[in-house]
Amino acid sequence: MPEGPEIRRAADNLEAAIKGKPLTDVWFAFPQLKSYQSRLIGQHVTHVETRGKALLTHFSNDLTLYSHNQLYGVWRVVDTGEEPQTTRVLRVKLQTADKTILLYSASDIEMLTPEQLTTHPFLQRVGPDVLDPNLTPEVVKERLLSPRFRNRQFAGLLLDQAFLAGLGNYLRVEILWQVGLTGNHKAKDLNAAQLDALAHALLDIPRLSYATRGQVDENKYHGALFRFKVFHRDGEPCERCGGIIEKTTLSSRPFYWCPGCQH
């Protein structure tokens, strides 16, 4: 399943295609959304927001399309008039004069008013998004030490969207490797330096992944570009200590770590 950085890049692609352009055609598959089709013609998308793995497509008439891709949903951008050859089931079409965005296969789709945005069950449950530029390490540290989270093992906590939205399995293992901790550690047991390092890594690594993952290091950025240090690298030597990276299962998900320097 895509994690926060991949969801944010998808949102960027949608914004680049249709943001600010009048909608010339709107179509929804679900009957409960049909009445919104005519209300959105002539309106435009103001911005696309991510809340963890959910997308909020905001329109100029203050309505917001909530969509969660879950396992199978996918957005595509096409030239207007193009009909992709696919076996997926179309759920949403938002068309402008030159570009159209299409949502396939998702089942969790709703239209929300500003009031409903503040009471939506999923949006109420999720924590701050790690890619929110206004989220600071100080706020993350406060959440780590809060009564709700301080006694939780990181193996489960870093997958819990109520703690921080947008984290997932590859980010979980890369963050813990970066700070030299295991999945069994808890925030209440860390010293001040460890807490500070973890709070920064919880933001820095997702943001680096969002900004640079998939780019080729052609200009020799000396490690600044995101790349996996332990994820899917079991059996390989750890670049930090030379120990052998191992794979186990924690919180029902594959977990990669180096016993030599994560303890």
From Swiss-Prot:
Its cofactor is Zn(2+). One of its GO terms (molecular function) is class I DNA-(apurinic or apyrimidinic site) endonuclease activity. SUPFAM superfamilies: Glucocorticoid receptor-like (DNA-binding domain), N-terminal domain of MutM-like DNA repair proteins, S13-like H2TH domain. It comes from the Bacteria. Pfam families: Fapy_DNA_glyco, H2TH, zf-FPG_IleRS. Its EC number is 3.2.2.-, 4.2.99.18. DNA binds at Q70, R125, N169. CDD domains: EcNei-like_N (cd08965). InterPro entries: DNA_glyclase/AP_lyase_DNA-bd, DNA_glyclase_Znf_dom_DNA_BS, EcNei-like_N, Endonuclease-VIII, FPG_cat, MutM-like_N-ter, Ribosomal_uS13-like_H2TH, Znf_DNA_glyclase/AP_lyase. Gene3D superfamilies: 1.10.8.50, MutM-like, N-terminal. Keywords: DNA damage, DNA repair, DNA-binding, Glycosidase, Hydrolase, Lyase, Metal-binding, Multifunctional enzyme, Zinc, Zinc-finger. Binds 1 zinc ion per subunit. A zinc finger (FPG-type) spans 229-263. One of its GO terms (biological process) is base-excision repair. The keyword Repeat does not apply. It catalyses: 2'-deoxyribonucleotide-(2'-deoxyribose 5'-phosphate)-2'-deoxyribonucleotide-DNA = a 3'-end 2'-deoxyribonucleotide-(2,3-dehydro-2,3-deoxyribose 5'-phosphate)-DNA + a 5'-end 5'-phospho-2'-deoxyribonucleoside-DNA + H(+). The active site is at P2, E3, K53, R253. Belongs to the FPG family. Involved in base excision repair of DNA damaged by oxidation or by mutagenic agents. Acts as a DNA glycosylase that recognizes and removes damaged bases. Has a preference for oxidized pyrimidines, such as thymine glycol, 5,6-dihydrouracil and 5,6-dihydrothymine. Has AP (apurinic/apyrimidinic) lyase activity and introduces nicks in the DNA strand. Cleaves the DNA backbone by beta-delta elimination to generate a single-strand break at the site of the removed base with both 3'- and 5'-phosphates. This is Endonuclease 8. It comes from Escherichia coli O6:H1 (strain CFT073 / ATCC 700928 / UPEC). The lineage of its organism: Bacteria, Pseudomonadati, Pseudomonadota, Gammaproteobacteria, Enterobacterales.
